[in-house]
Design a protein with these regions (language model features):
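Secondary-structure transition/capping motifs at alpha-helix termini
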Residues: 64-69, 81-87, 105-106, 118-129, ...
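Secretory-pathway-linked proteins and extracytosolic
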Residues: 1-76, 80-87
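Short, conserved helix/loop micro-motifs enriched in His/Cys and acidic residues
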Residues: 87-107
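Contiguous, well-ordered alpha-helical segments that form the cores/surfaces of helical PPI scaffolds
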Residues: 76-77, 101-104, 114-119
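Hydrophobic alpha-helical scaffolding
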Residues: 24, 61, 65, 103-107, ...
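Hydrophobic/aromatic-rich core segments of domains that either
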Residues: 96, 112-182
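Short acidic (Asp/Glu) and glycine-rich catalytic loops that position anionic groups and cofactors
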Residues: 51-57, 94-98, 136-137
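Phosphate/nucleotide-binding catalytic core
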Residues: 28-30, 91-94, 115
Length: 182
C-alpha cells in the first residue's frame, strides 16, 4: 500500500512492501529520475529532438560565423529580435503545437523561447544543452527532496572550449551569461 507525502507523485515517496520479505521499500525519486522524465517528455525532450523544425530558421550569415562565442551571441540576438516572451514561466512547451506553434506565432512561454534557442544553437553546431532551474518566484529549490514541480525555468547552457556560457532569450536586453531577473 503506497503512502505519498504529497499529491505530487514526483516527490519523495515511501511505500510498504507486502511481499514475502515485508518491510518498508523506498520509492524515492532522484534528480537523475527528474532529468529522465524531462528528456522522455513530449513537451521537453521530444521537442528538442525535432531538428527538422529549425533547419531553415537561422539566416545563412549567422550559420557561417566561425567563432563559437560570436555565433552563440548572434543566435541569442536573432531569437530576441524575432520571438516574444508572453510573460508565462515554464520549463517546457505548454501549447499543443509546441515549438511549431512558437515558430508560427512568434510568441511563447519562457520554456518555448529558450528551447527554441537551444535547438537553433545545436543546429548551428554549438554544444548547447538545457539547464533547468527554479526562479526566486517559484521558491527555494529543495535539493534533498527532488520534484519536477520545483522547476519552472530553462536556459541554454553552452560549453565553448571548456568555458561555460548561459543564454536566456526571454528578455530583449540579456547578453551571454545574463539571466533575466525573476
Amino acid at each position: 500500500r503506497a503512502e505519498l507525502n504529497s499529491s505530487n507523485v514526483t516527490k519523495t515517496a515511501q511505500a510498504y512492501d507486502n511481499s514475502d520479505s515485508g518491510g518498508f521499500k523506498s520509492y524515492a525519486i532522484t534528480w537523475k529520475d527528474i532529468r529522465k522524465q524531462l528528456y522522455d517528455s513530449q513537451y521537453f525532450g521530444e521537442e528538442l529532438k525535432r531538428k527538422s523544425l529549425v533547419k531553415d530558421v537561422l539566416p545563412q550569415d549567422i550559420k557561417n560565423i566561425e567563432n563559437a562565442e560570436e555565433k552563440a551571441a548572434a543566435i541569442l540576438k536573432f531569437v530576441q529580435k524575432n520571438y516574444t516572451w508572453n510573460k508565462n514561466y515554464g520549463e517546457a512547451v505548454q501549447e499543443e503545437g509546441g515549438i511549431r506553434s512558437l515558430l508560427n506565432t512568434k510568441v511563447g512561454n519562457s520554456g518555448e523561447i529558450n528551447l527554441l534557442l537551444i535547438m537553433l544553437m545545436k543546429s548551428a553546431g554549438l554544444e548547447a544543452e538545457p539547464l533547468v532551474l527554479a526562479t526566486i518566484r517559484n521558491g527555494l529549490l529543495m535539493d534533498h527532496s527532488p520534484s519536477i514541480a520545483q522547476l519552472n525555468y530553462v536556459v541554454a547552457f553552452v560549453d565553448i572550449k571548456g568555458k561555460p556560457f548561459l543564454y536566456d532569450a526571454t528578455s530583449k536586453l540579456t547578453v551571454p551569461n545574463m539571466i533575466r531577473p525573476s
